[in-house]
């Protein structure tokens, strides 16, 4: 969640068979899409949309990684995880947490300290 230049999506594309990345800024989404295609990252699908809402169409996901801070991992994103899926999110409190989904429960583990811009709801047309 949070495509930006597409760098993180490209790295993840080297590790996974397919990657869906969601960006709220159309100009960033379009540029990242073209950049990733030109570099051969056909396994990365770039979506222009409200990343805070995730992308239900392609759910469930094995992993969801946020590049923007949230106060708490949104329940609707956890719901888009596959069984045994993992969500990684920086929190506005300054820590990065890993949330493991197991059956109907979720277990959270803090594993890093980071300061990241907060998530913003909605979409934007241009940067």
Where are these regions (language model features)?
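Active-site capping/gating segments
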Residues: 90-127
């Amino acid at each position: 969640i949070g495509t930006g230049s597409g760098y993180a999506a490209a790295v993840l594309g080297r590790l996974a068979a397919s990657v869906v990345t969601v960006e709220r800024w159309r100009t960033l989404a379009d540029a990242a899409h073209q950049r990733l295609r030109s570099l051969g990252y056909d396994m990365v699908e770039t979506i222009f949309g409200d990343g805070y809402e995730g992308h239900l169409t392609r759910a469930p996901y094995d992993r969801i990684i946020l590049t923007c801070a949230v106060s708490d991992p949104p329940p609707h994103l956890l719901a888009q995880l596959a069984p045994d899926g993992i969500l990684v999110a920086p929190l506005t409190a300054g820590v990065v947490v890993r949330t493991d989904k197991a059956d109907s429960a979720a277990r959270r583990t803090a594993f890093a300290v980071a300061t990241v811009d907060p998530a913003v709801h909605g979409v934007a047309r241009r940067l």
